[in-house]
Structures are given as structure tokens and as C-alpha cells.
Amino acid sequence: MLLLPPRPPHPRSSSPEAMDPPPPKAPPFPKAEGPSSTPSSAAGPRPPRLGRHLLIDANGVPYTYTVQLEEEPRGPPQREAPPGEPGPRKGYSCPECARVFASPLRLQSHRVSHSDLKPFTCGACGKAFKRSSHLSRHRATHRARAGPPHTCPLCPRRFQDAAELAQHVRLH
């Protein structure tokens, strides 16, 4: 069941004297200056969000009804700080260690450190890692023991990449 706001009774007479004047229109909110049309906290408080509904009364006469909508909070829910304590840090906190991160993606990346899953495995020695960047760093240790594979035919220098060797040979 839909409940509508009360509407004053519609006069039976259609004479101009008997009709109610139309409700005054709310002035439009000023647009924010600058490249963005969204108001910022530096420009002052935001105008209230209004929901306008076109309704029809019992006699079939349309009228508008305006309500102020509640602002939805942005970001994670905020906790209240005890008196005398600094306010809560804004962000997303880790449920394991309570570290706070600015974005949910950073939190998700951090939570890998608490898991026992190690999906990245070294093909040379079988050692496993939680992050691909750690595996890449580890692979360099295998290359360091063997030394760079590309040796200059004109001098004792060695290079990891064949393109670097070719550039070096041109300098001779």
C-alpha cells in the first residue's frame, strides 16, 4: 500500500478566485564554479538532495511533492572515538591486524600476507611465494649464480639481455 502526503481538498468551482495558488517553486541551487560541477567541501556545505515526485490527487489534478533525501555515507563506516582520543582514521581496516588502508584494493592486497596460500612457484628450485613480485625477485638469485648469459666477444663484459649485448658491441 502506497501512502501519499495529504493534499488540500480540490475546490469544486473552477473560478480563478476559488483555486489555490500553485506552491512556490524552490530556487535552484547555484552551480559549483570550476571544471567540475560537483560541489566540494571547500566550496561550502552541499545542498540537500531533494526527491521530487509527480502525484495526482483524488480529482485527477497533478501536483508535485518534494522530500529531502538522506545522504548516503561514502566510504567505510566510521567508528566513534572515545572522549579524549583522536578521531578514527578514515579508511578500510584489516580484521586480522587492524592496519588501515585508503582503498579496498590496498586492503585486499594486504590480506594476502595473512593467508598461507603460496600460488607462485619457482620452476628452478620449487620454492613458493605469496606474491608474483617476490617470485620475480627470487628468480634473479638463480641468474646471479650462473652469471649473465650473454658475453661480449670483444671484452669480458656479460649481459642479461641480448639486446643490451648488441648495443654494447656497437660501441666497440
From Swiss-Prot:
Q: Where in the cell is it found?
A: Nucleus
Residue ranges covered by zinc fingers (C2H2-type)? 92-114, 120-142, 150-172
Tissue spec. comment: Expressed in endothelial cells.
One of the entry's Gene Ontology molecular-function terms is: sequence-specific double-stranded DNA binding
Instruction: Give GO terms for biological process.
Output: cellular response to hydrogen peroxide; chemotaxis; inflammatory response; positive regulation of endothelial cell migration; positive regulation of endothelial cell proliferation; positive regulation of gene expression; positive regulation of interleukin-8 production; positive regulation of leukocyte chemotaxis
Q: Summarize induction of expression.
A: Up-regulated in presence of reactive oxygen species (ROS), like H(2)O(2), through the NF-kappaB signaling pathway. Up-regulated by sphingosine-1-phosphate (SP1) through the p38 MAPK signaling pathway (at protein level).
Composition-biased stretches (Low complexity): 31-44
Q: Which GO terms describe its cellular component?
A: chromatin; nucleoplasm; nucleus
SMART domains the UniProt entry points to: ZnF_C2H2 (SM00355)
Q: What is its main location?
A: nucleus
Position of cross-link Glycyl lysine isopeptide (Lys-Gly) (interchain with G-Cter in SUMO2)? K31, K118
Q: Which Pfam families match?
A: zf-C2H2
Region (Disordered) residue spans: 1-93
Could you list this entry's UniProt keywords, alphabetically sorted.
Answer: Chemotaxis, DNA-binding, Inflammatory response, Isopeptide bond, Metal-binding, Nucleus, Repeat, Transcription, Transcription regulation, Ubl conjugation, Zinc, Zinc-finger
Q: InterPro entries, from UniProt?
A: Znf_C2H2_sf, Znf_C2H2_type
Q: Where is composition skewed (Pro residues) in this entry?
A: 19-30, 75-86
What domain of life does the UniProt record list for this protein's source? Eukaryota
Free-text function comment from the UniProt entry: Involved in the regulation of endothelial cell proliferation and migration. Mediates H(2)O(2)-induced leukocyte chemotaxis by elevating interleukin-8 production and may play a role in inflammation. May be involved in transcriptional regulation.
Q: How does it assemble?
A: Interacts with SMAD2.
Q: What is this protein called?
A: Zinc finger protein 580
Task: Give the species this sequence originates from.
Answer: Homo sapiens
According to the entry, what is the taxonomic lineage of the organism?
Eukaryota, Metazoa, Chordata, Craniata, Vertebrata
Q: Which gene encodes it?
A: ZNF580
